[in-house]
């Protein structure tokens, strides 16, 4: 679960789509981890009378990818097909939806446990889940674990989910009541999240219900009334993103990228690359969902971006030419630039978000470059 590669796998999986007045893009990267354990769901237009609803989620697996993969394929069905969600005839009420989401999580968790026991020994993998269910009137934020979702409204972070960590007082109380302990901020000194799907080794305390176990599958659900004028975008991401970027930082960075491109896949790729260069060592997945009032491409912002790239290119060339013998390594170039007051760097991303631009110029000007040299070795992180 904690093993790392000698160099990161930087290939990305992308997707994008639109409908119901929404646009979305997503990006995921294995990064430094030995295995890719993340998964995701993106569905615009749900079946059975919910054509104007949409669902998006990120799943961050651990100790294997089985639970994350199963949830990405089946969690939505467990949510929308249970009686608590449907309630009476017609569109489900807010309380129906919230109860149905909770029931769906508990049902799929129990279903996976039964399936696992029927096989050769229980599956030991688990997964966080963070998602949004978007109706024409409401956005329902869903969280179980330490992945995170946030809503940017009127250029500010309006809402974000709370991470479920063992050190949280309420989580710690439940863990201790189930006979467990919190050591080095982990459940029984091992698991770093206090709520998750799967992780059945932590859900076998006799006399305790499913939401009273060492690790609970119960999600927190928050309903937020939509604001057509002010809602701009939603970000869903695993902790590989949040480990190196704060809520406001990521919100500011995404907003700045939306002012220079309307390609949401590209924006998500920039988020993932920037987090890698900021030092993230985990799998990374991010979904960006834009409302009609999301920032639009600005000619002024595009011009400033081009000027910044040109400035960085000239500075890299100057640094290389200044070297008396040979060519300085890329780490030296990055550290030199990091020590300077460079205007107009993307907020939140800063110099790390321009690593690809800098590296491209460096490689073009470096006659000694080895094409097999990894572009993000551990020594490069400054």
UniProtKB/Swiss-Prot annotation:
Membrane-topology descriptor: Lipid-anchor
PROSITE patterns, alphabetized: PPM_1 (PS01032), PPM_2 (PS51746)
Cofactor binding comment, as recorded: Binds 2 magnesium or manganese ions per subunit.
SUPFAM superfamilies for this protein: PP2C-like, Protein serine/threonine phosphatase 2C, C-terminal domain
Protein location: Nucleus; Cytoplasm, Cytosol; Membrane
UniProt subunit comment: Monomer. Interacts with SMAD2; the interaction dephosphorylates SMAD2 in its C-terminal SXS motif resulting in disruption of the SMAD2/SMAD4 complex, SMAD2 nuclear export and termination of the TGF-beta-mediated signaling. Interacts with SMAD2; the interaction dephosphorylates SMAD2 in its C-terminal SXS motif resulting in disruption of the SMAD2/SMAD4 complex, SMAD2 nuclear export and termination of the TGF-beta-mediated signaling. Interacts with the phosphorylated form of IKBKB/IKKB.
Family statement drawn from the similarity comment of this UniProt entry: Belongs to the PP2C family.
Protein name: Protein phosphatase 1A
Gene: Ppm1a
């Amino acid at each position: 679960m904690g093993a790392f590669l000698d160099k990161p796998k930087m290939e990305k999986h992308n997707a994008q789509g639109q409908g119901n007045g929404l646009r979305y893009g997503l990006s995921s990267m294995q990064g430094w981890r030995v295995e890719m354990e993340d998964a995701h769901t993106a569905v615009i237009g749900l079946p059975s009378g919910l054509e104007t609803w949409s669902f998006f989620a990120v799943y961050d697996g651990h100790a294997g990818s089985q639970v994350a993969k199963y949830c990405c394929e089946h969690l939505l069905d467990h949510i929308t097909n249970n009686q608590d969600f449907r309630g009476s005839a017609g569109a489900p009420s807010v309380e129906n939806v919230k109860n149905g989401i909770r029931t769906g999580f508990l049902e799929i968790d129990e279903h996976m446990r039964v399936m696992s026991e029927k096989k050769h020994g229980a599956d030991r993998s688990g997964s966080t889940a963070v998602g949004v269910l978007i109706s024409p009137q409401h956005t329902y934020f869903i969280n179980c674990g330490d992945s995170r979702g946030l809503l940017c409204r009127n250029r500010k972070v309006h809402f974000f989910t709370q991470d479920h960590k063992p050190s949280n007082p309420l989580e710690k109380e439940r863990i201790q009541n189930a006979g467990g302990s919190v050591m080095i901020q982990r459940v029984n000194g091992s698991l770093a999240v206090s709520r998750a799907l799967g992780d059945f080794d932590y859900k076998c305390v006799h006399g305790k219900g499913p939401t009273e176990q060492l690790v609970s599958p119960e999600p927190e659900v928050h309903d937020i009334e939509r604001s057509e004028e002010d809602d701009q975008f939603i970000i869903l991401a695993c902790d590989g993103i949040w480990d190196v970027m704060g809520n406001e930082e990521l919100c500011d960075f995404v907003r700045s990228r939306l002012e220079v491109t309307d390609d949401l896949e590209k924006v998500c790729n920039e988020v993932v690359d920037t987090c890698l260069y900021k030092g993230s060592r985990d799998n990374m997945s991010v979904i960006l969902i834009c409302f009609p009032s999301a920032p639009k491409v600005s000619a002024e912002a595009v011009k400033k971006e081009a000027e910044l790239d040109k400035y960085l290119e000239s500075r890299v060339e100057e640094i290389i030419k200044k070297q008396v013998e040979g060519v300085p390594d890329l780490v030296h170039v990055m550290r030199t630039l990091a020590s300077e007051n460079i205007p107009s760097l993307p907020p939140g991303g800063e110099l790390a978000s321009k690593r690809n631009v800098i590296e491209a110029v460096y490689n073009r000007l470096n006659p000694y470059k080895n094409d097999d040299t990894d572009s993000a070795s551990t020594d490069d992180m400054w």
